[in-house]
Amino acid sequence: MLEVKTVDKPDERRDFPRGHLDALHLTGLDFAVGTFEPGWRWSESVAPIAGTESCMVHHNGYVVQGRMHLRMDDGGEVEVGPGDVFVCPPGHDAWVVGDEQVVVYDFAGGMAQGYAKAAGA
């Protein structure tokens, strides 16, 4: 079966401090668009919602705009920007770099399914 949806009309939206997530759910694909404002940091904006010390969601991402810094719990770090495709396993923090909004497309599914949802929700 063919399915088409537009990011302009997501199935759900989750707001959190300094950002929001739009999720689209299709057969075999849960797709997310994350929008993060300057000053956003996962450990400050989403950790209180998730109830974990670091982000435990796996990401397969594409950066549309802005720059984001990722720091793994094991100390590994990277900065991603427009046009970058990245894989980030669970166990990390992240934050916006600079004063430009960050927009990330995430194809891994976990972000669309459970990101910024309270544990057990």
Q: Where do the model's predicted regions map?
A:
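Conserved GNAT-family N-acetyltransferase fold
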Residues: 34-36, 61, 86
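Conserved short histidine dyad/triad with adjacent acidic residue
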Residues: 33-54
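A short, N-terminal "cap"/entry segment at the start of jelly-roll beta-barrel domains
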Residues: 1-35, 43, 119-121
